[in-house]
């Protein structure tokens, strides 16, 4: 990782500039999806052995990308359009993290049906499911950390869907804390504070960003204020300036 940005997009810039690149963004995302789907069916053997190392390496073999985008699943169309804009305007290929994390549950479902389901009781074994979940999450989080380490730039797509101020009282007292309820976003932002900065081999600056989705009623809050404070703030006018330099 060479640099990291905290990007807060505006509705105006999205509607007038980025949105028209959604079609290409969809194509990029779909290509990544096919790679992920292929990966899911390849490394679970008939004798019950899961090749975690090969699975992890294949899962992120498509991540030799210029940019990693971290985002909320609620912003997926905006992020796809943003990825299309980066490709069309700068020739940069961005990896959208939810392309992989969105299939985390598919992988777990496949494993659980094969190894955790009791056909007689027609139920899943609770302890085995905890075991498989911990393994899959560990494999994917490790792979993501390696991916982030090998990427020049990370862009956090910061919207109200990803970050919220903790409460009104803290705002009044000037003790703002930026909170996320997504464990994957928390993991990614935390990693940006721990990864060593690497000088790129070429002079151009690239961007990258990863994200995650939270779809359950259980909400766990993570304070990511420190991680965001260490990022470079990025706004629409910076994007326009970069585009004009092309």
Predicted segments — roles?
Residues 1-23, 191-246:
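C-terminal tail/extension regions appended to the core domain(s) of diverse proteins
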Residues 2-151, 246:
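Conserved N-terminal substructure of TIR/SEFIR domains
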Residues 97, 155-158, 205-209:
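Short beta-strand segments at enzyme active-site cores
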Residues 55, 97, 180, 237-238:
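Acidic, low-complexity intrinsically disordered regions
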Residues 116-137, 143-195:
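Conserved beta-strand-loop-alpha-helix hinge of the TIR/SEFIR fold
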Residues 87-95, 186-202:
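Structural alpha-beta junctions
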């Amino acid at each position: 990782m060479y640099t990291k940005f905290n990007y807060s997009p505006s509705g105006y810039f999205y509607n007038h500039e980025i949105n028209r690149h959604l079609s290409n963004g969809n194509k990029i995302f779909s290509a990544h999806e096919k790679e992920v789907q292929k990966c899911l069916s390849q490394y679970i053997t008939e004798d019950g052995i899961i090749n975690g190392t090969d699975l992890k390496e294949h899962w992120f073999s498509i991540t030799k990308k210029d940019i990693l985008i971290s985002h909320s699943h609620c912003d997926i169309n905006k992020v796809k359009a943003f990825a299309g804009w980066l490709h069309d305007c700068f020739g940069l290929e961005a990896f959208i993290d939810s392309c992989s994390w969105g299939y985390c549950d598919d992988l777990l479902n496949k494993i659980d049906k094969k190894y955790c389901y009791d056909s007689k009781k027609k139920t899943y074994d609770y302890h085995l499911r905890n075991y498989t979940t911990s393994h899959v999450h560990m494999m994917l989080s490790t792979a993501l950390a390696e991916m982030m380490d090998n990427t020049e730039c990370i862009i956090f797509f910061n919207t109200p869907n990803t970050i919220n101020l903790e409460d009104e009282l803290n705002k009044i007292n000037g003790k703002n804390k930026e909170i996320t309820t997504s464990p994957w976003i928390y993991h990614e932002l935390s990693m940006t504070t721990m990864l060593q900065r690497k000088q790129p081999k070429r002079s151009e600056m690239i961007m990258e960003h990863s994200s995650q989705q939270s779809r359950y009623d259980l909400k766990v809050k993570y304070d990511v204020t420190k991680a965001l404070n260490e990022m470079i703030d990025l706004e629409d006018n910076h994007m326009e300036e970069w585009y004009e330099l092309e």
